[in-house]
Amino acid sequence: MSPSPTRLAVRSVDPQKTPNLTSKAPARPSRKSEWVETTAHLRRKPCHSRHNSPAWEISGPPWSSQDHLGPHQASKPSTQRFWSPGPPLARAQAWEPIPPHQKKLCHLSSTSLPRETIASLPCKSQTLRQEVRKHWSPELFPRSPGTSDLKTLASEKTTALPLKNLCHFRSVEKNSGAIAHPQDSRESSHKSALAASSRQSRSRVRSASLPPRTRLPSGSEAPLTDHSARLSDLLLTSHATAPRWRSPDPCLRLAEPPLGSTTTPLSIWTAPQSQVMARPSKSREPQIRASAQRDPQLSEKQPRWKEALPPPLRWKEKSPLRREGTDLPPSLKQWMPSQPLLPKPSLPDLMLELLRIPRCSQIARAMPEKTGQPQERLQISSRILKNSKKPQLSAPILTEGQPQSPQPLLPSPSLKAAEIQPPSQPPRQSLPPRPSLPPGQPLSPRWSPQPRQSLPPWRSLPPGQPLSPPRSPLPGQSPLLEPIRPLEQSLAPQQCQPLLGQLPLGQPMQVHWSGEPGHSQLLPPLGHPFLPAQQLPPGQPLLPAQSLLAGQPLPPPAGPILDPPAPRSRLLTRLLRGLLRGRLPGLTSTSGAEAAAGTRHRLASARSSPPVMSRKKGPPAASSGFCGETAALACPGATRSGATQSATSSPEPSEAASVYPSVPDHDPSAPGRPRILWRRGANRCAKKPLRCESRSAQIRNAASSSTSNWRRRRWTTCVHTACCF
């Protein structure tokens, strides 16, 4: 392949030599390769005194070797670089002053150079040449003439070459070749060198070249060994000497990577992840201190974390025992271990029971003084209870002759439940009368015990001893455990409820009738706000005032407490039942049911045909009528009198009753809030459909974005369904 004539003008190619890749480079580089120059350092302005400097040699292109140049350009200083990206060119030919293609011996022998040339060299390069003559070896110069080969290239890669020396050796040998030319053509040689370098240095790559400033200052004669040590570290001479793992400063290349580094090769770039780290590293990467998650080498240490977890568990296992063993008085300690299967009582339970013990003994001491009229009532009610509740009791009632199986006095609720659930066991003594008392209510004198019962010793018995029970489980015992009831209920409601003879928790309400109007008592669901005046809400501990109340006879409050609860209980059960059924409480007769059905239908119709009501004015007369009527049905006045209001009745009495909860015509102890809420709920249900409808109509007509339309409409429908369901 012969080069084009334009190329021949620039460069004469040796015909015997097979052109290698570097000789194929175009004389006029294409546009594409021009941008590469921007990465390289700028070329310096030509200056005669710096003619010999390695900057020239550096900026020269890799393929411009002197053996290819014609005689016209023989005077150009050589620009071949030893680290050229292409394969090394055989330096078979060196320059004589006259014939272009004569072969020559080693350049560095000073005999081959004319005297004037050696004289014209700067003193630095002369000293360099002398040193080279002493220390020169083919190892140092892999491209010395005749040895340039692939082998030497490999050896060059293995050997880190001190760059600075090489620059000077090259400049010496090239300049010596160039300056051998007669001195008169100095100008032309300079111009041609400029042209060639500017033409061909464009495709030079920055990473292959050295910036010119790494050159020694021209006057200095620093010892070469220092430079070889320092420069080989600071400058990446060949591809092989490039550091195997990157680090911010090359002096640390030989330091081994820090201990816990995530990636061993990129040790300093990545933040060290060792657990031993005393201070956060200065790397910009966010620090994870002693992170076992991110560090693969710490996976073996992970089990330590898992071992660290069990001690709290062990402590938890130990803690109930500790509570049982140490925190309890001896009386409680005896029965505590006897509950193997049951959940361990929590600390509040035990505290409450401890609180309870002295109070109960006080009550027992105070008991025998109470005698008189309430006892007769007690006997009557207990007889009635025996008759009415016999089907509910699971075992025969104890008589005086039977010894009672020794049972702990104050068992935890779980124990009680365990005793009561197997039906074969005799029930606790206090079972039968218990239903006739609201759960938390403290003693009222009607429950005072009969004097023949040996109650105080029973109260103070240690749990293990057998009890000598009275003839029948008269309610006289119930006061002993009565003050305890709210606490136990608060502790374990599910277990106490079967005790009380109630239905399980799911069912709303149970009323126990003992035959007399005074004894019908409702056991409201736990947490219910409607408790009588003396009754404890189940969450509270016993207050001292209430324990006092329990301990002493209180004749005056007995009257009001005894009588009103009957209608209230009826009302509450009806309310709840109505809530479950159709949300219309208080219907006692079929006519009332029909009326309710009528109102329900009317409610539905009002919901389906809202335009009758306008948003601003509220519901029309008919709807207000039935609103008031639902409120009237909700109000307990109607229930208590047993009269039901018809569907067309006017709302006045019910409004009076519901707006003023303390109006004296219904029982004062019943709280008034539910009625107001009920009333409000009915009104809201009546008005809601129209409000929703009108607003959605407004929105439909409004010119707003579709999304907000949709959102608002969806919201109104949600509210509508929630409130009016």
From Swiss-Prot:
**Where do the segments described as Disordered lie?**
1-93, 177-226, 256-340, 396-481, 508-528, 584-624, 638-675
Put simply, this protein is called: Protein ALEX
Q: Which family does it belong to?
A: Belongs to the ALEX family.
Q: Name one GO molecular function term.
A: G protein activity
Q: What is the lineage of its organism?
A: Eukaryota, Metazoa, Chordata, Craniata, Vertebrata
Provide the GO biological process annotations. Answer: adenylate cyclase-activating dopamine receptor signaling pathway; adenylate cyclase-activating G protein-coupled receptor signaling pathway; cartilage development; cellular response to glucagon stimulus; embryonic cranial skeleton morphogenesis; embryonic hindlimb morphogenesis; endochondral ossification; energy reserve metabolic process
Q: Where is the composition biased (Basic and acidic residues)?
A: 297-307, 314-326
Identify its membrane topology class.
Peripheral membrane protein
Q: Which organism is it from?
A: Mus musculus (Mouse)
Bias type Low complexity, positions:
584-598, 643-658
Role this protein plays: May inhibit the adenylyl cyclase-stimulating activity of guanine nucleotide-binding protein G(s) subunit alpha which is produced from the same locus in a different open reading frame.
Q: Which domain of life is it from?
A: Eukaryota
Q: What spans are recorded as compositionally biased (Pro residues)?
A: 423-442, 459-473
Give the subcellular location. Answer: Cell membrane; Cell projection, Ruffle
Subunit details: Interacts with the N-terminal region of the XLas isoforms of guanine nucleotide-binding protein G(s) subunit alpha.
Q: Where is the composition biased (Basic residues)?
A: 41-51
Q: Which UniProt keywords apply?
A: Cell membrane, Cell projection, Membrane
- One GO cellular component term, please give it: ruffle
Q: Where is it mainly found?
A: membrane
Q: Does the keyword Cell membrane apply?
A: yes
Give any extra note attached to this record. This protein is produced by a bicistronic gene which also produces guanine nucleotide-binding protein G(s) subunit alpha from an overlapping reading frame.
Stretches of Polar residues bias are at 260-276
